[in-house]
Amino acid sequence: MCTAATYRTKDFYFGRTLDYEFSYGEEIVITPRNYEFNFRHMGQAEEHYAIIGMAHVAGDYPLYYDAINEKGIGMAGLNFVGNAVYAEVTEGKENVASFEFIPWVLRQCATMDEVRALLAKMNLVGTPFAEQFPASQLHWIIADENEAITVESVADGLHIYENPVGVLTNNPPFAQQMFMLNNYIGLSPKQPENSFAKDVPLNTYSRGMGALGLPGDLSSASRFARVAFTRMNAVSGDSEAESVSQFFHILGSVDQQRGCCEVAEGKYEITIYTSCCNATRGIYYYTTYDNHRIMGVDMHAEDLDGTTPTCYPMIEEGQVSWQNGPN
């Protein structure tokens, strides 16, 4: 499964974990302004905003998992199995396949008002990319530096929710996830005072007891609550190093270790990668399961007026910076 989050210091940060039992060979992909997107039902788009994100490239087409555009909008698709239902292609509407939803939004939206206007006339359909790539059951988080929304296509239509916590995981649906945060209304980063009974002499015996009851398992509902609490209470300096470090700490609160989430005999879900995008500056940072050294790709270091995507395979081998000894 997966977890996505937003965070703001001086700049705006957006990212996610990809938690799964295997990789599709995803890469960091920069799509320049003049790459020709061929949308299945909406024709060609030859000019658009530049995009950087994590994608599986199939037939020279970037199938984005998460991405930002040069205007500072971030978007990620996360598993929503059992609840996602896409519409049928309808004449007279802007029919957008789920696999092209991220570039459809990021290629043309510079503000969240533009995102909302686009969604109001969009028909999200289940047209597959290819026979071997059926439509994935997803829902999405879209955000800029000021706000975030969640988009879910379900049996009764397309729903757009304000997302005040800037977090998305998987099931259950977003409205239910938000409601369940009521269960944690008493949690605090501060040490608790005895409100159990004034005549019972109860005292704290450890630091961190204000968050007793915050779930620690790897289910999507628990990850939602844990990252929401961590994100909403996280304190960071404004420098790039401090901000990026803090963002990775926020998503690190739901890091999945091999062996803790068995999905089949001998197969385990792990955090394949964690991303942190500085959406203000167009930089894509990431770590992988075996490489916790933060790697970075800057979209503005490439020719953004080009026609061909630039791909950077993830550096997955662990790296150690020695202070003495072996180099």
What does each model-found stretch correspond to?
Residues 1-93, 121, 126, 311-315, ...:
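A contiguous strand-loop segment
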Residues 1-13, 127-128, 135-136, 144-147, ...:
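C-terminus-biased signal that marks the final domain/tail of proteins
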Residues 15, 76-78, 151-152, 285-287:
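Beta-strand residues in well-ordered beta-sheet regions across diverse protein folds
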Residues 20-22, 81-83, 156-159, 166, ...:
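Short, surface-exposed beta-strand-loop junctions and turns on beta-sheet-rich folds
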Residues 28, 68, 149-153, 275:
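Broad, structure-driven detector of short, well-ordered beta-strand segments within folded domains
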Residues 92-128, 240-248:
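Proteins synthesized as precursors that undergo proteolytic processing into mature forms
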Residues 112, 116-152:
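Aromatic- and glycine-enriched pocket-lining scaffold segments that form the walls
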